[in-house]
């Protein structure tokens, strides 16, 4: 994707500009010109094992700069020479070390992981909003979100999630209407939102710290350490090994799977009248209509698919280069699959958002909080509709809002990259 390639170029500039890669300024200036004029090398997403850097994908970047292969400019894929010439960018004539400096590095896997991190923040934010709506629709208790419970466990992210849910529900007539009910303990998918999504939030925060380190890293090899007067050392090491990115990508994958898992369980809870005290499957005429039955089945299918996709990529090392590269990270594959997982998770959360909106419609004329009413007005202005209907376009529309970060501002203070 265009935004990933732009990030790859920016990360490569940042690494080379540190001054340890033995390249001329003209190499960096050419990369910057490509960014400024939006001439982007055509880089494949596959072909890297995440050690010796992202060699194959970055080879396509380097090739374009010398006029080999293709580039994308103005939305069109062109021969690289044609694209560069049209933009007034001179072809690079590489000198010693410069080709290797362009090929070596973790920029592709890091760019993909950063994209996955931002996407995970958006899905987690939407999941918190969906969870708050489900609490309202199912007449769930907010007692388990009491700050004292979370303070004694000592996990800041857990406390932060609990506080965020309380803020979302604050001022709700629905919540006030059952304050003195006899319900003692809700199912874990409601009661343990702070514990589950708080742990996911901690994973995202930790991932951000590691990826920021990697974004500012010199992951070339060998490295050049000048000592002045033209002297210095050229040292071969292993900074190209993307294990930090691989482990982060795997952690993000597990977190994304868990966000989808708990959201799907709340979808199941909403269509079950035994707990929700709502019509079966949220149907206007239960028994005659299916309501949200198949929407929940879809959410279950996507949650299970994500469980398979969450298998750690980093444990699947495979030797390459006649055994010289005998341990590799698989970081690029691990980071690339995050997009598929995020798409699935966004669809699951969209099903929950729509299901909860339908449930709240049955609680009218009581209103939820001002913040959640604004969400309802956007996702389901008709209250989730009546009768059986074609739900796919609605799910896709709300999932697109999730992926676009529409709900993230409601809980933006939680996330490490909210300055984006």
Language model feature labels by segment:
Residues 1-43, 117, 135:
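Glycine-rich, flexible loop motifs
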Residues 2-16, 44-66, 95-109, 295:
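FAD-binding core of FAD-dependent oxidoreductases
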Residues 37-38, 64-420:
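C-terminal auxiliary extensions adjacent to catalytic cores
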Residues 29-36, 56-63, 125:
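A broadly conserved amphipathic alpha-helix scaffold signal in soluble, globular proteins
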């Amino acid at each position: 994707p265009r935004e990933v390639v732009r990030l790859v170029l920016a990360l490569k500039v940042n690494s080379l500009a540190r001054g340890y890669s033995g390249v001329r300024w003209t190499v960096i200036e050419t990369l910057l010109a490509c960014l400024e004029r939006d001439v982007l090398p055509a880089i494949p997403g596959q072909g890297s094992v995440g050690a010796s850097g992202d060699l194959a994908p970055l080879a396509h970047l380097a090739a374009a700069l010398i006029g080999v292969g293709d580039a994308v400019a103005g939305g069109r894929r062109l021969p690289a020479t044609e694209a560069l010439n049209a933009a007034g960018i001179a072809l690079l004539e590489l000198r010693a070390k410069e080709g290797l400096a362009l090929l070596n590095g973790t920029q592709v896997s890091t760019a993909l992981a950063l994209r996955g991190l931002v996407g995970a923040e958006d899905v987690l934010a939407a999941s918190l909003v969906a969870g708050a709506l489900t609490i309202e629709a199912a007449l769930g208790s907010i007692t388990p979100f009491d700050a004292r419970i979370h303070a004694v466990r000592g996990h800041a992210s857990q406390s932060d999630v609990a506080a965020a849910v309380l803020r979302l529900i604050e001022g709700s007539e629905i919540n006030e209407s059952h304050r003195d009910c006899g319900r003692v303990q809700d199912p874990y998918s409601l009661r343990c939102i702070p514990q589950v999504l708080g742990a996911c939030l901690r994973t995202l925060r930790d991932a951000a710290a590691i990826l920021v380190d990697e974004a500012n890293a010199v992951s070339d090899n060998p490295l050049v350490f000048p000592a002045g007067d033209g002297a210095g050392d050229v040292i071969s090491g292993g900074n190209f090994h993307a294990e930090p990115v691989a482990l982060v990508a795997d952690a993000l994958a597990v977190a994304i799977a868990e966000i989808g898992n708990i959201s799907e369980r709340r979808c199941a809870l909403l269509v079950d009248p035994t707990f929700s005290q709502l019509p079966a499957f949220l149907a206007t005429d239960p028994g005659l209509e299916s309501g949200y039955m198949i929407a929940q089945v879809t959410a279950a299918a996507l949650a299970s698919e994500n469980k398979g996709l969450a298998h750690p990529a980093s444990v699947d090392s495979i030797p390459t280069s006649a055994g010289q590269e005998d341990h590799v990270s698989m970081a690029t594959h691990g980071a690339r699959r995050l997009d598929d997982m995020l798409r699935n998770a966004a669809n699951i959360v969209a099903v929950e958002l729509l299901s909860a909106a339908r449930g709240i419609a049955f609680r009218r004329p009581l209103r939820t909080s001002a913040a959640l009413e604004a969400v309802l007005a956007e996702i389901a202005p008709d209250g989730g509709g009546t009768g059986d209907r074609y739900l796919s376009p609605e799910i896709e529309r709300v999932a697109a809002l999730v992926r676009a970060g529409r709900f993230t501002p409601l809980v933006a203070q939680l996330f490490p990259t909210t300055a984006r």
